[in-house]
Each structure stands twice: as structure tokens, then as C-alpha cells.
Amino acid sequence: MASTQAQKALETFERFLASLDLESYQQKYRPIKTVEQDLPRELNPLPDLYEHYWKALEDNPSFLGFEEFFDHWWEKRLRPLDEFIRKYFWGCSYAFVRLGLEARLYRTAVSIWTQFHFCYRWNASCELPLEAAPELDAQGIDALIHTSGSSTGIQIKKETYRSEAKSENRFLRKQRGTALIEIPYTLQTPEELEEKAKRARVNGETYRLWAKVAHHLDRLENGFVIFRESYVKSIELFLQKNAPTLSGLIRWDRVAQEALTAP
């Protein structure tokens, strides 16, 4: 059984997610896309996000609000920030650039918080050990799940209907034979997706697959979408049955069809 520590970490993290004023953040940051350049390594927020929000081994974890997190990140990087601003935003005020970076980091943080919830939920509900670290994240791996004799990467896959080019993940290039599983995730409700499937002239089956995914997700009162226990347990069972034979990229639609149970 999962530890009391893991369950407590999950509950504490969910309380943090529920405390976020998502509507205010969206109104403030959604229109702002002034900082779209690739950030230099010195400004990479991933190590800070892991430091402040991935606390799976702590007995009494606590989590910073986004504003406090951003203040910490900003104050630690005054010199590289000054160089970045002089290079790309000469003549602009620090306030202008700061707001642009706030919006940029908020979008990154929401994505990271989502994958962290999957990891906290996994630790609280599953037996297979999970590993998460910024070094893995930099390779496109949200977490590693260890089975007997192998390790499988996971990557949260947000809902999309665009055709995508098939490109090999950096992690898979470095470790031949290792599998990477896409974990489908949608912000839409099952009812919304079922209705779209009924009305669709194309993509009807895809909408139905996403509706199946949505049945394994839940929504906090503020609208943040989180993973149900049924989701991670379905993925664990899929890995226990198939891990030795999995290799390469396991796309989200196969996961939805074979791993997730129908409602």
C-alpha cells in the first residue's frame, strides 16, 4: 500500500492547487506574450519549480503561491536578467519585461503543476516506484516509472486535434529500447466531448477517445483539472502487463484505447 506520507503530500498539493485564483491569473496573463524568446540556461525556471513544488519525500510539505515563487525566481537571477533585458528589450522598462516573464512562467508553472499532480497521485495510489527530476524534464520526460528490469518514461499529452510530425524524443534517442508513454489530458468535460463527437463530421472517434480520458479526470472548485485514482491505477496495470514488450513512443490514443477503462 502507498505510504501515509504520499497520501498527505497529495492532499496538501491538491489544497494548494485549489487555492489558486485561476480566473484572475488567466485574465491577467492570457493576453501577454511579450517574452517568447528561448530563455538562456541561467533563467530556466525548471530547477526552481522542482525545488518549491516537488516535495514527495517531505513529511510536512508546503507550497509557495505563484507570486512568491516568481519573486524568489526573479531575485536569484538579477544579473542574468539584466543581460537578457539588455539583449532583447533595450529601452523597455523592467516592469514591462517582468510582467512578460510573469506570464511566461505562469504558463510553464501550470503545466508543471499538472504533471506534478499526476506524480503525487501516483505515489499515493500505486506500487511501482516513480522518479521525477528537472534533469529528466529537460529531456522531455515528466517522470520515470520503474518496473522490474525496465524504466518507462511518461509525458503528459494535452488534447490536440492537429496532425503532428513523428519525431523521436531526446530521451528515446539516448536510451534505445526504453518506452515513452503519452498520458492524455484534457480540460474539457466528458459531456462536452461526447456532444462534440455526436456533431462531428470528422474526428468523431477522436472526440470519443478524449471523452474516455475525461472520465478519469476530476475538476477542483477553481477549475484546475486533476487526475483520478482510476487513471494512475489503469496506467500502472497497463505497465505491469506490457512493460517488457513496450518500446519507442506509445501514443496517447493507444493509451486511451488499451489502458483506460470505459465509464
UniProtKB/Swiss-Prot annotation:
Biological processes, Gene Ontology terms: DNA restriction-modification system
Reactions mediated catalytically: Endonucleolytic cleavage of DNA to give specific double-stranded fragments with terminal 5'-phosphates
Keywords: Endonuclease, Hydrolase, Nuclease, Restriction system
EC number: 3.1.21.4
An annotated Gene Ontology molecular function: DNA binding
Highest taxon of the lineage: Bacteria
PTM annotation: Only 15% of purified enzyme (upon expression in E.coli) can be sequenced, suggesting the remainder has a blocked N-terminus.
Listed InterPro entries: Restrct_endonuc_II_TaqI
Protein name in UniProt: Type II restriction enzyme TaqI
Source organism of this protein record: Thermus aquaticus
